[in-house]
Amino acid sequence: MNHSSKKNKNRILRNKARIYCDVNLHKPKEYWNYEALNVKWETQDDYEIIRKIGRGKYSEVFEGANIKNNEKCVIKVLKPVKKKKIKREIKILQNLCGGPNIITLYDVVRDPQSKTPSLIFEYINNTDFKHLSPTLTDFDVRYYIRELLHALDFCHSNGIMHRDVKPSNVMIDHQKRKLYLIDWGLAEFYHPNQDYNVRVASRPYKGPELLVDMEDYDYSLDMWSLGCMFAGMLFQKDPFFHGHDNIDQLVKIVKILGTEEFYAYLDKYGIVVDHTILSIIGKHPKKPWSRFITKENQHLAVPEAIDFLEKLLRYDPAERLTTREAMEHPYFKPLSH
């Protein structure tokens, strides 16, 4: 893959966000310069671990409690990673604190001996998405997707890309009809002329730009991931694009969206993809979305849902709906504002 990266340095056209492009230009440097963050570590003695509730590549997650007031919390114990990455996550959580549907960071603590850092978050009475999704009504899907858009619009408007949107990073308290976007460990500040690491997001939710080494991606990466998640909900098939490796992931996408628009996207930006990969991809017509509609999902896969999906799952990042445009889509009309 590196071979194509070098070639892609001299591309004919660079990509730029269509919305919120210069947000960080108008913010003070300390807003986005997370490496300069001086973390004020608190003592972890105020918190106790109750039970393990999850684990990721970079952390282990526990249900915990604040001993002082007996309030439940979530304790995210970070595995050894670069200091820079921890600072980035903390800075982003601080910047977004209080935003709509954004998980609240209560505290940052570390073990005085081992120096292992932990992040303390509000507790959410979460229903596992895999179990919840099949039970959701048409109205529920519209409602929760719009709630997720509120969180994404807030983070994008604050100059931040999440870069790991997927069902397991969306917590839903269905009783309270509250949604939270969690796990900001891969989130990053958007600067229009910066190149970014393409090794982000989980494979089924990776945008085509990541799979072809397009390093000048932007917020619209999150809109692709949202589209994948939405497709999974609509057609009750999650993950919707299920590749076994990154090349196979691209093949899965191309077999549905077709090769014609894929090559048009590569040509527009002058993206070079390895010949061996192109030969694996081959040539495929675009599949109509109606192919995926069944008796079981037709109550969800209504025409305006398909129209909305189609406007998210575009190869070209510049063609995808922005968060603002997405919220204006007729699909959300039935929700009272």
Curated annotation (Swiss-Prot):
Catalyses: L-seryl-[protein] + ATP = O-phospho-L-seryl-[protein] + ADP + H(+); L-threonyl-[protein] + ATP = O-phospho-L-threonyl-[protein] + ADP + H(+)
* Gene Ontology terms: cellular component: cytosol; nucleus; protein kinase CK2 complex
Q: Which UniProt keywords apply?
A: ATP-binding, Kinase, Nucleotide-binding, Serine/threonine-protein kinase, Transferase
Biological process GO terms, please? Answer: asexual reproduction; DNA damage response; DNA repair; regulation of cell cycle
Q: Name one Pfam family in it.
A: Pkinase
What residues bind ATP, as annotated?
53-61, 76
Task: Provide the E.C. number(s) assigned to this enzyme.
Answer: 2.7.11.1
CDD domains this protein is in? STKc_CK2_alpha
SUPFAM superfamilies noted in UniProt: Protein kinase-like (PK-like)
- Gene3D superfamilies hit by this protein: Phosphorylase Kinase, domain 1 (3.30.200.20), Transferase(Phosphotransferase) domain 1 (1.10.510.10)
Protein kinase domain location is 47-332
Q: Which residues form the active site?
A: 164 (proton acceptor)
> What terms describe the molecular function in GO for this protein?
ATP binding; identical protein binding; protein kinase activity; protein serine kinase activity; protein serine/threonine kinase activity
State whether it acts alone or in a complex, and with which partners, per the record.
Answer: Tetramer of two alpha and two beta chains.
Its family remark reads: Belongs to the protein kinase superfamily. CMGC Ser/Thr protein kinase family. CK2 subfamily.
Its name, as the record gives it, is Casein kinase II subunit alpha
Protein source organism: Dictyostelium discoideum
Gene that produces this protein: casK
